[in-house]
Structures are given as C-alpha cells and as structure tokens.
Amino acid sequence: MRNTDKRRDILDLKIGKSVKYTAAAFSGAFMHLTFLVIFAIIQLYIMVIFNVFSVGLYIVLGLICKRENFERRAYNWVSAIYFEIALHSFLCTLFLGVNTCFFLYTMMTIPVMLYYLFLTCEKKMFKRGTFLFSLCSLALLSAALTFDHFCDPFFYTFRRPLTLNETDLMRTINIAFN
C-alpha cells in the first residue's frame, strides 16, 4: 500500500457524533485549564475561580457526551456553554482590557454555537437560539468594548497594568484558541 493510500484511509474514517462532542468538550476543559494557570500566575483570583467552574462544566459535558446523552438535552448544554463562554469573555475584557483579545470569544461563539444547534436541535429551537445568542453577544460585546473605551480595566485599577510579556502571552493564546 502506498503512502498516499494510507492517508486516504485515515481521512475516510467515520467518527461518531459522541466522539466529536466529547473531543470538543475536553478541548474546552483544556483551554480553561490553561486560562486557570495564567490567571493564577497573574493573581486574578476571581477568574481562577470562574475557570475552576468552567473546567468542571466541560469535564461533566465530556463525560455525558461519551454516554451519547448529549443530543437529548442539546439545547440546554449548548446554552450553558454559550453563556459560560460569553460571560468569561466579558469578564476577562472588563478585568484585563481588549489588548488581551478575550473579546474575540464573544464573536466566535455565534457561529460555533449555532453550528452545534443546527446539528442537534429542531428548527424552532435553532431560530430561538440564533436570536438569543446573537442578541446577547451583541450586548455583551458592546458593553465590554464601551467600558474599555471609557475606563481602565479593573485589574489595572486594583493591582497593576499587565506587562507587555503577559499581554502578548494572553493575546497569543487567545488568537490560537480562536
């Protein structure tokens, strides 16, 4: 068998939905574990606590996906994940400012969450989710960017401005994860 034939065989693998959802959930847990470490290093403890919750949410979701129960309550899980991501993005933008690029997650949530809704929910739920998630994303993004325009980030107010290396590290991680 030639090398190109082997590659084609790998690309033709059929991967079940539960494996895809499980991989996405554990990827989310890994991302938040990374954020947890970064926030612990810069001593932003409110976000450390938030990320402990986030890691737990994604691990529970990953375990549920393994049992293939995800699609029965897909709208609830997608909504929980959406609001976790949107709130995390909003709080990080308030605490750390737009230079760290956490606001990108607010924009990223719309296509990603709507894709999951499209795959798992009825048309009525999809339309409701589209409207709700888009409106919430617009409101949170507008509020965070307006706050950042007129005020210093909370972390700067209570602690210190981030160093250029800290800002670059967070920006790099956020762009890579988005």
What are these regions (language model features)?
Residues 11-15, 63-77, 118-130:
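Membrane-interface helix-boundary motifs at transmembrane edges
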Residues 33-53, 71, 96, 119-178:
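Alpha-helical transmembrane segments and their interfaces in multipass membrane proteins
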Residues 1-15:
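Short, Lys/Arg-rich, polar N-terminal cytosolic tail immediately upstream
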Residues 12-24:
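Juxtamembrane helix-loop boundaries in multi-pass membrane proteins
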Residues 23-113, 137:
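Hydrophobic transmembrane alpha-helices and their membrane-interface boundaries in multi-pass
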